[in-house]
Structure formats: C-alpha cells, structure tokens
Amino acid sequence: MKKLLLCLILLATCKSGFAQVETPLNFTSEDENKVVKETDSGKYYTASKDADLTVFVGEDPMMYRLFDKDNVLLVEGTLVADGDKYLHQGKWTEYYGKGKVKVSGYYVRDRPMGNWRKYYPSGKLMSSYTYAPIENGGTPYYCMAGSYQEYYENGQLKVNGFYKAVIDESSRDTVMVQDPMTGNDTKKIVKGTRPRAEKYGPWEYYSESGELTKKEDL
C-alpha cells in the first residue's frame, strides 16, 4: 500500500538573509491512520499523531486536504504517485482558517517551483518570491532565485531585491557510484554541489510611509 505523507504544507526556503523554514507538523502513513469516513470522492483519516487533525485524500484527482477539529480547512493541494509514495504536485495552499490564504504556490514532484506568495490574515500580500531549477553537474536542484518583495500590511513596499543562486561550497551530497573493479554500487560524498540563494544587485528598504531608508548594491 502506498504511503501517504500527511503533513502541513512544506515551505522550506534556501535563501539567506531572510531565511525561514516552515516544517511539517505531522508525518504518518495510510497504514497508521484510522479511516473515519469514506465517500465516492475519497477517504477521511484521523491523523494518529494528532487526533485534532483530519486528512482527506481524494482518488481522482489525487487531492489532499487537512482540517482542524472544527472542520476548518488548513491545507489543500494535489498529489502524484511515485512508487510507494505520493509527492506534492501542482498548486498547494495553506490557510489561516475560514478561507483566508496564508501561503500559496506550486510544487513539481515535492519541490517548490515558480512564484510563491505569503499573505497577512487580512488578505493583504506579505511577500512574493520565486523558486527556479538550478542544474549542477547534471543534477537539478531547486532554489530561490529572481525578484523578491516584502510588503507592509497597508500595501506599501517594504523590501525590494533580487536573489541569485550560487553553489554552496560547504554543502555535501551522498551519491551512488559504481566501483569499476567490482561493479558494485557504493556511496560517495560529493562536496560543493547544492546551490543557495544569495542577495544580488540593488536592494531597497522602505518605511511604512514609503520613505527609502536603506539601499544596498551587492
């Protein structure tokens, strides 16, 4: 039986300076969950590690929805099968509750891609940023790259800048390589393979009234 990654939306950024990571609240599998209701469109599960959370998994399309104890929608998105697992694929949205969007963006096989946006509880845009595939040595990585903006709740621009992807020389990856003598696969540690986001070019910072308070040229 395929395992389900039943969790709150992942928003793991690789940026520096404004680094922030929102980690999953709950991981579990279909085998460990209790089916509380089954409908023509899918099944509702009670997450075993948090009885206050209920997960809906639809079959066609492969939908994922997470509800709190009051049946308020917290997260929704689409999934794609990958062997014995399901991956985030397509649009994913996290909510404050009562339909108020907190974070919205797209995934490609569990990797954030394209434009992502965060919102205040009032519905005003908080920030906008972009993820792009960065290839290094034939391996695609996903990193924040491109324009970046933050806003005050009154709509005034707070930060305006640009990120570029650079190779992090301190990063390490484990890859499988074939031993030419034995033909057996073995693990090898490869250094300096992963990209990270780095501020680039002009960065501008504004007060809530719109006054330019700081400018950098990186």
Task: Put a short name on every predicted segment.
Residues 1-25:
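Bacterial Sec-dependent N-terminal signal peptides
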Residues 19-218:
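Glycine/tyrosine- and acidic-biased, solvent-exposed loop/turn segments at the edges of beta-strands
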